[in-house]
Amino acid sequence: MKAVVFAYHDMGCTGIQALLDAGYDIAAIFTHPDNPGENHFFGSVARLAAEQGIPVWAPEDVNHPLWIERIREMKPDVLFSFYYRNLLGDEILNLAPKGAFNLHGSLLPKYRGRAPLNWVLVNGESETGVTLHRMVNRADAGDIVAQQAVAIGADDAALTLHRKLCAAATELLSRALPAILAGTTDERPQDHSQATYVGRRTPEDGRLDWELPAQTLHNLVRAVSDPWPGAFGYAGANKFIVWKSRVRHDLPAAKPGTVLSIAPLIVACQDGALEIVTGQTERGVYMQGAQLAQALGLVSGAVISSKPVVAIKRRTRVLILGVNGFIGNHLTERLLQDDNYEIYGLDIGSDAISRFLDCPRFHFVEGDISIHSEWIEYHIKKCDVVLPLVAIATPIEYTRNPLRVFELDFEENLKIIRDCVKYNKRIIFPSTSEVYGMCTDKNFDEDSSNLVVGPINKQRWIYSVSKQLLDRVIWAYGDKNGLKFTLFRPFNWMGPRLDNLNAARIGSSRAITQLILNLVEGSPIKLIEGGKQKRCFTDISDGIEALFRIIENKDGRCDGQIINIGNPDNEASIKELAEMLLACFERHPLRDRFPPFAGFREVESSDYYGKGYQDVEHRKPSIRNAKRCLNWEPKVEMEETVEHTLDFFLRTVELVDDKNP
């Protein structure tokens, strides 16, 4: 009978060997690549397959149509799963006419799910076992083919029980596999009303809570002892691991966590006490309990905890490249309002951040990211969070200097991304609403909207595509290399210090700054294609608060996320923005210092931006991810933002005029 096998771990090796011994023809084996973060004490399915001359694969998604088709071509009679970590879809299960069978490490229907071996010890069970059952589209719910019970001894820990289960699996399979081969199995349905479910365990689940009974903690120690990560506690700020313990009821009661003795090392619990027979400090070696007490500096009467009691707080170091820019200087101001952050910044100028230069938590170097690569790499290594905010982000430059846009926005930022991967640093990358391009969705969604750009001869898309490709590179590094990242997409942020009027004079600024320059100089406001394009304008204070919460990253909710940051309620056309700005200008107290309004003038985009430009009719964000990950919503109405922005620039002009009469 031809079999295709899905297997991992010692149980995988046990199952494969049993199939070979029973005379099955194994056409292929599917397994998992070893995780470098795991302690690989178990046998290698891949190595066993290679030694037996059996083809072996470890696909990321075995349920992908390409792999389904490959398995179909193998024409298996039967499928077996031995501790394979992923569920097999119906399309695979239906490929084998004799059915699909799974080996599970408990006496089903009890302990369906992940890590039953550890859970039975945690719960103090006296019996467990292994079950061979038919696979259905619900995990561990199919008819039972055979079971083998295993007694759990009082001295059993995770490894000894694991070995017992492997031996039981060998015995069970020696009976069941020939029956499957002969078609003589005696199967029975599970009683689903008796089913219990357990979930995946993590190292954090090994935390010792001294408020619990000593027997409960002893069971936990047994369940996660070596080669699993171990049960742990804290003496002050020092973490220690308990590998072996015993319950003591012969000492007087005391406050939970109190050290009752150091030789042997005994700690009071809610009910009884726990003797730590062997353990180790976090970076130490395996040792007896009395030596562990000495290494931790414990004395009788000391109190230990489940969490670090004394933790030296270090500020989060944030590296901001482009710190003098619009987002950079406002973000610096917000971070310095919180004592938890220390900022390292680099930019080619310092006019916008001069107000922070005397702050001891702000460290600034004037420089160019294309020149100061060694400084940047050193500070990426030194800091905790990296925000590469340097980019050319003004539309006229996309057609005027497309290669410079590519060199700075893509090539220089790619170096920074790779350094973050190299030093395992979290990157918060400024994507852009431009990546959505000419998307036709009513609201642009980070996870489902298509990213639509124009033809190659429309060079204005070089910015959008450069940013999109970096988004994809970062995503791939996160998926394949474990890079911690968040991508944020600003939607038309406005406020004080957005560009400057000198940049607007040469056309290298965002829309509102250009419009303010027209009012200040008394020149006509140019409306590209009539100013019908709609945007959603976001106050810089709202945007920065969202970005601050991304940096905070409470409970890791922003890891691996793409987050639009915009105000969908502040949607307006460029013409409506200009009219609102004009109304604010006319009632401003400094209005009489400036020339009369010169009117609106409609111009074609090719006349203003040059050939290669293509505009976008609307750009409205979905902020579902921002609400979910950040508990954030924008608050500032558009007119208030326009007033503040205009006031800042008009008073800047006033200061210049006062100095230069």
From Swiss-Prot:
(6R)-10-formyltetrahydrofolate binds at R114, V136, N137, R138, A139, D140. The record marks N102 as: Transition state stabilizer. NAD(+) binds at D347, D368, I369. SUPFAM superfamilies: FMT C-terminal domain-like, Formyltransferase, NAD(P)-binding Rossmann-fold domains. The active site is at H104 (proton donor), E434 (proton acceptor), R619 (proton donor). It catalyses: UDP-alpha-D-glucuronate + NAD(+) = UDP-beta-L-threo-pentopyranos-4-ulose + CO2 + NADH; UDP-4-amino-4-deoxy-beta-L-arabinose + (6R)-10-formyltetrahydrofolate = UDP-4-deoxy-4-formamido-beta-L-arabinose + (6S)-5,6,7,8-tetrahydrofolate + H(+). Pathway: Nucleotide-sugar biosynthesis; UDP-4-deoxy-4-formamido-beta-L-arabinose biosynthesis; UDP-4-deoxy-4-formamido-beta-L-arabinose from UDP-alpha-D-glucuronate: step 1/3; Nucleotide-sugar biosynthesis; UDP-4-deoxy-4-formamido-beta-L-arabinose biosynthesis; UDP-4-deoxy-4-formamido-beta-L-arabinose from UDP-alpha-D-glucuronate: step 3/3; Bacterial outer membrane biogenesis; lipopolysaccharide biosynthesis. Bifunctional enzyme that catalyzes the oxidative decarboxylation of UDP-glucuronic acid (UDP-GlcUA) to UDP-4-keto-arabinose (UDP-Ara4O) and the addition of a formyl group to UDP-4-amino-4-deoxy-L-arabinose (UDP-L-Ara4N) to form UDP-L-4-formamido-arabinose (UDP-L-Ara4FN). The modified arabinose is attached to lipid A and is required for resistance to polymyxin and cationic antimicrobial peptides. This is Bifunctional polymyxin resistance protein ArnA. The gene is arnA.
